[in-house]
Amino acid sequence: MAETIRIIGIDPGLRYTGWGVIDLAGNRLQFVAAGTVSSDVQCDLASRLCQIHKGLSEVVHQFMPHEAAVEHVFVNKDATATLKLGQARAIALLVPAQANCPVFEYAPNKVKKSVIGVGHGAKEQIHMMVKVLLPRAEFDSNDAADALALALCHSMHRKRIDQSYQARMAI
């Protein structure tokens, strides 16, 4: 029987941070849970980051993933918005790392290519393929669906990552 690897995908955002947890056993994928951590827009930035940290910490503590996949930040024209997203992303990287969970990062185009077969696609296509690959998946937001897509992407690439790591260790 294949070892089960639990993967959490995290789609960082300052207002909404999506998360999705799947189990991978051999080639079998199983939906575990998904949701969204929200921060209060009325609060200052530091308080909002604390809210995201607390929420993600609870999720990681509850589901105890073995590996994490986090989306790379895209740079947009609004430097302030990009910086704030980067701060939320730092929390998304920090929380699993604090739980001794290796963190892997994926560009949005790589996630789309892995899940729907092309690097550019509508959110609806991604959500549809998440449901095809994880028929029991339930998600409360686009962010949670995107987080499940991140976890799926990592499940497809982790064998290659593992082989690359083992090859480096053999040198």
From Swiss-Prot:
Molecular functions per Gene Ontology: crossover junction DNA endonuclease activity; DNA binding; magnesium ion binding
A Pfam cross-reference name: RuvC
Enzyme class: hydrolase
Entry binding sites for Mg(2+) 1: 11, 143
Cofactor binding notes: Binds 2 Mg(2+) ion per subunit.
Superkingdom classification of source: Bacteria
Catalytic residue list: 11, 71, 143
Residues involved in Mg(2+) 2 binding: 71
SUPFAM superfamilies in alphabetical order: Ribonuclease H-like (SSF53098)
GO biological processes: DNA recombination; DNA repair
Keyword Hydrolase among record annotations: yes
Annotated Gene Ontology cellular component terms: cytoplasm; Holliday junction resolvase complex
Catalytic activity: Endonucleolytic cleavage at a junction such as a reciprocal single-stranded crossover between two homologous DNA duplexes (Holliday junction)
Subcellular location: Cytoplasm
Assembly information from the UniProt record: Homodimer which binds Holliday junction (HJ) DNA. The HJ becomes 2-fold symmetrical on binding to RuvC with unstacked arms; it has a different conformation from HJ DNA in complex with RuvA. In the full resolvosome a probable DNA-RuvA(4)-RuvB(12)-RuvC(2) complex forms which resolves the HJ.
Entry's family note: Belongs to the RuvC family.
Name this protein carries in UniProt: Crossover junction endodeoxyribonuclease RuvC
Organism in which the protein naturally occurs: Bartonella tribocorum (strain CIP 105476 / IBS 506)
Lineage: Bacteria, Pseudomonadati, Pseudomonadota, Alphaproteobacteria, Hyphomicrobiales
Gene name tied to this protein: ruvC
